[in-house]
Swiss-Prot record:
SUPFAM superfamilies for the chain: YbjQ-like
PANTHER family the record matches: UPF0145 PROTEIN YBJQ
Gene3D superfamilies in the cross-refs: Hypothetical protein apc22750. Chain B (3.30.110.70)
Organism for this UniProt entry: Bacteroides fragilis (strain ATCC 25285 / DSM 2151 / CCUG 4856 / JCM 11019 / LMG 10263 / NCTC 9343 / Onslow / VPI 2553 / EN-2)
UniProt record similarity statement: Belongs to the UPF0145 family.
HAMAP family, A to Z: UPF0145
InterPro entries in alphabetical order: UPF0145_dom_sf, UPF0145_YbjQ-like
Protein name, UniProt field: UPF0145 protein BF0226
Signal peptide region: none
Pfam families per the UniProt record, alphabetical: YbjQ_1
Length: 106
């Protein structure tokens, strides 16, 4: 499954547009991991443990979107967009959404 943020793929022809596809995942804050991440990762200016969780959430959302496109008969998703939004009463969870247009390329 080809995923692209662009509306076209150079050298390929779109023969079928299947429609909008999306995938979502929500990750919750872990108090203990947050505490240890702040101690361990602040020194370098980046939080490696947070980055890994975000990467996994992004990959899960993209995988769900790709599977939805595959079930429609598509072999690519164009115009892919990733959105990150805090949800929950105190913003304690993060929702990652991937969306795009499922197409068939030749």
């Amino acid at each position: 499954m080809l995923l692209a943020t662009t509306p076209i793929i150079e050298g390929k022809r779109i023969t079928t547009y299947y429609g909008i596809v999306s995938g979502e995942t929500i990750i919750g804050a872990n108090v203990f991991r947050d505490f240890f991440a702040s101690i361990r990762d602040i020194v370098g200016g980046r939080s490696g443990s947070y980055e890994e969780v975000l990467r996994e959430a992004k990959d899960t959302a993209l995988k769900e979107m790709s599977e939805q496109a595959r079930q429609m008969g598509a072999n690519a998703v164009i115009g892919v967009d990733l959105d990150y939004e805090t949800v929950g009463g105190s913003g304690s969870m993060l929702m990652v959404t991937a969306s795009g247009t499922a197409v068939f390329l030749e």
